[in-house]
């Protein structure tokens, strides 16, 4: 309950918007595509969610990062375009960590091309994450990452 959610590459916002009635609060949705961002804005408005509960940040979160809304992120959804280098994804996590924007018990849901499995495993290990769960759906992999204890 009360988990702070970051939904990077959010279009159409379904994951984070569905997390809100399940106890998440707030959700930050990031989307670089203008048309997709407009769909997210319409979805937020249709659900009558105020900016205190769901906020759209247009632009490329992988390039610029995102500031946590007063509390660190507990849950991050990452579903970037499959051509995205996994190093960019782990770079975002590193920048968020350096900004103290990640909860100690953070969970990351990372969907990526299955051909990147080895790179993701290596980057997770060297970045302080473990793959707690991995599922394959055709050419797609869904990893649930957890932070390793650093103390």
Per-range role (PLM):
Residues 1-151:
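Class I S-adenosyl-L-methionine-dependent methyltransferase catalytic core
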